[in-house]
Amino acid sequence: MNLKLLVFLLIVLGFRFYLFYQNQVKFADGQEVSFETAILSQPQVVGSQHRLTANYKNQKIRIITSRFPELNYGDFVRISGKISSKNDRALMYFPKIETASQSSNVLQAGLQKIHTLRQKLIVLFSKTLPSPSSSLLLGIIFGIKEQMSKDFSENLRATGVFHVIAASGMNVTLIAGFISSLFALFLKRQIAIGLSIFGIAFYAVLAGLEASIIRASIMGILVFSAQIIGKQTLAVNGLFLAGFVMLFISPNIISDIGFQLSFTATLGLIFIPKIRAIRKIGVIGDSINTTIAAQIATLPILLANFGTYSIYSILANGLVLWTVPILMVVGGFGAILGLIVAPLGQLLIYLCYPLLLYFETIVNFFGGIGGVLVVNNFPWQFSVGYYCLLVSGLIIFKKK
């Protein structure tokens, strides 16, 4: 990207940030509010509670409410209650939530249809596979974690594989890379990358077209489109331009972990060179290489936000992530077919069972042997120093 253009865009973005935060409302502790909003991400179910995030006057409000009545992605609701403002975070505990009337909205109607479709698929998967295999496959394809057992969920976290079921930006980036590697074994590179782009779009729809998934999908499609053309510069320019547009429209996403992981993981896949010796292993080697690149790029973000890191993470990811595109393709087609002819769809879904058992065995094995590093009060100075060293190393490597 032209240096003058980059400086200009940064100045524009800086001015946009200034205006955004100058006009941002500061909520007082105990302040009464009432507002209408659409639920643009699937609420989390934790025990007997619903947890969701709502946007009000350019502020994110974390809401904790009762499990019933059920709230779904795409619902338009009126929320009334008191705000608890602590440490610059706005929370609402058990506010009054009512269904709000709204004029016909094509987008909202589409979102509600997607939710209804997902609910039917959840029932289909649960009837076909035992737990935790059904919940694992639901997590991989739809990012649904509510039905997963606490023990297995903890093992996923302990081994650094939790991102697979998080429907996150990092997940989109990794999955696209794996699909490309898989199809490149028997198809031309351009066709394999084209199928990866289709896979990204397909995943975004199945995951519910949530904002974080759409952002990550745009980044992934830009990168893989540039690979078809054969210009790394185009991928970088496209990624930075996408990041600029997203931040200009919604400056508060700069603190969103999903956005941070999407952006840095994608940069890692573009710039961090693949290890040739590992690449010779085949599909698993490509999985390990992709994992290494993504984890090198995102390590400070993961440590700062989650405070833990598994020393076996790269190995565990390399052993299981090659199964993800297969599970997504077979399970995804099984889900679609199951809506038309349930028995045939269930047959395809059941074909995923051996790979799911393999996945679970690896996760439970590494989750049971420990090796988790706990980092408390992660210093921001480390992140700055880490990325300075990483950029310097890549520049030196490129010159050789």
Q: Which residues does each PLM region occupy?
A:
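Membrane-interfacial loop-to-helix junctions in multi-pass transporters
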Residues: 130-134, 149, 189-195, 323
